[in-house]
Amino acid sequence: MAQKQTPSGPSQRQQRVAELVRHALAEVLQRGDIQDPVLGSHVVTVPEVRMSPDLKLATAYVMPLGGQDEAPVIAALERHKKILRQEVARRVNLKYAPELRFRRDETFDEAARIDQLLRSEKVQRDLESAPREDDEAEPDSASRD
């Protein structure tokens, strides 16, 4: 009997539901439906949501605009997890309302780190000393004459 292979990434259904949950969370946070002083004083972005294969768990990656005060914002979201779950269930038609988990979005930090690495002296020196493809292509074109 052949074993069922698991795909390497999320299924199309997981991605579609994750996007619906992301939109629902962003709408609730934007409208200010949750009465909390921390959430009221911060604009919170939800750049990504990842769903579990059974669609019962949604991990939302959040970041306050400006990237400051992440811990209080995530704590406030955790406090209001039940209300947020109810709002997501109202907006997204699923058999089960997914349990919500909130994590800090680190993609901006990672992008800044990679940008800093690319601008470092070592990388610049390597780029200057490496032969370019244009230089290698010139002798071939000269031999055709």
Curated annotation (Swiss-Prot):
InterPro entries named among the record's database cross-references: KH_dom-like_a/b, RbfA, RbfA_dom_sf, Ribosome-bd_factorA_CS
**Protein's name according to its UniProt entry:** Ribosome-binding factor A
Q: Give the family this protein belongs to, as stated in its UniProt record.
A: Belongs to the RbfA family.
Describe the protein's quaternary organization and the partners it interacts with.
Monomer. Binds 30S ribosomal subunits, but not 50S ribosomal subunits or 70S ribosomes.
Annotated keywords: Cytoplasm, Ribosome biogenesis
Q: Which GO terms describe its biological process?
A: maturation of SSU-rRNA
UniProt source species: Methylorubrum populi (strain ATCC BAA-705 / NCIMB 13946 / BJ001)
GO CC, sorted alphabetically, is:
cytosol
This entry's Gene Ontology molecular function terms read: ribosomal small subunit binding
Which SUPFAM superfamilies does the annotation name? Ribosome-binding factor A, RbfA (SSF89919)
| Segments of this protein annotated with the region Disordered | 122-145
User: Where in or outside the cell is it found?
Assistant: Cytoplasm
- Compositional bias, Basic and acidic residues, is annotated for 122-132
Q: Which NCBIfam families match?
A: PRK00521.2-5 (NF001802), rbfA (TIGR00082)
Q: Where is this chain primarily localised?
A: cytoplasm
Q: What does this protein do?
A: One of several proteins that assist in the late maturation steps of the functional core of the 30S ribosomal subunit. Associates with free 30S ribosomal subunits (but not with 30S subunits that are part of 70S ribosomes or polysomes). Required for efficient processing of 16S rRNA. May interact with the 5'-terminal helix region of 16S rRNA.
Keyword Cytoplasm among record annotations = yes
- Specify one Pfam family: RBFA
